């Protein structure tokens, strides 16, 4: 039982770490000399533009789409952290034989948020790049970066973690 508990805790921490990395790091769309993410576009290692600071004629078109991705990724990270804290509380407060349903529900909501954020980015990326050609002129010949891939891996991990909490019962 102790080994299973340790595995579940490590699995949850890894899931949360993946969410933090994918949300914070600048590698959702990458190429040889550029990178772009939810927060900024860097055309080289020193020339970065924050997408929320653009105003006037250079304003970021479709910023509401990017804000939706930002919000869902941040929410998924927060929900995963809350779910872990609730799991620790339930570990000491639940009666023997009860399930970790609340932890499972919150973790599955985190999973849903990651899926929504990554899906929106997948669907709207090309439109965002075409609408903001001045900002993304070097970024047309890129590919999805590791942060984007980590977001999808975090989706799978949070889903599996949520299911594990649903099945898990508290034992002695």
From Swiss-Prot:
Q: Name one GO cellular component term.
A: Golgi apparatus
Q: What is this protein called?
A: Epithelial membrane protein 2
Q: What is its main location?
A: Golgi
Q: Which residues are glycosylated?
A: 44, 47
- Where is this chain's protein located in or outside the cell? Golgi apparatus membrane; Cell membrane; Apical cell membrane; Membrane raft
Q: What induces it?
A: Induced by progesterone; initially expressed in the uterus luminal epithelium spreading to the glandular epithelium 48 hours after treatment, increases expression at the plasma membrane. Induced by estradiol in the cytoplasm of endometrial tissue; expression is induced 48 hours after initiation of estradiol treatment.
UniProt note on tissues of expression: Expressed in alveolar epithelial type 1, alveolar epithelial type 2 and airway epithelial cells (at protein level). Expressed in both the endometrial epithelial and stromal cells during the embryo implantation period. Expressed in the corneal epithelium, the sclera, the nerve fiber layer of the inner retina and retinal ganglion cell layer, the nonpigmented epithelium of the ciliary body and the optic nerve.
Q: Cite a single GO BP annotation.
A: natural killer cell proliferation
InterPro entries noted in UniProt: EMP-2, PMP-22/EMP/MP20-like, PMP22/EMP/MP20/Claudin, PMP22_EMP_MP20
């Amino acid at each position: 039982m102790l080994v299973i508990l340790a595995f579940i805790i490590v699995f949850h921490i890894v899931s949360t770490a993946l969410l933090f990395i994918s949300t914070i790091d600048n590698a959702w769309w990458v190429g040889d000399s550029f990178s772009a993410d939810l927060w900024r576009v860097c055309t080289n290692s020193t020339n970065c533009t924050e997408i929320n600071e653009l105003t006037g004629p250079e304003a970021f078109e479709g910023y509401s789409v990017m804000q939706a991705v930002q919000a869902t990724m941040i929410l998924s990270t927060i929900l995963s952290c809350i779910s872990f804290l609730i799991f620790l509380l339930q570990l000491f407060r639940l009666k023997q034989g009860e399930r970790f349903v609340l932890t499972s529900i919150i973790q599955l909501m985190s999973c849903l948020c990651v899926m929504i954020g990554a899906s929106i980015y997948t669907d709207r990326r090309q439109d965002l790049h075409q609408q903001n050609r001045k900002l993304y002129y070097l970024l047309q010949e890129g590919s999805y970066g590791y942060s984007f891939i980590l977001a999808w891996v975090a989706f799978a991990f949070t889903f599996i973690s949520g299911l594990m909490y649903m099945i898990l019962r508290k034992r002695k």
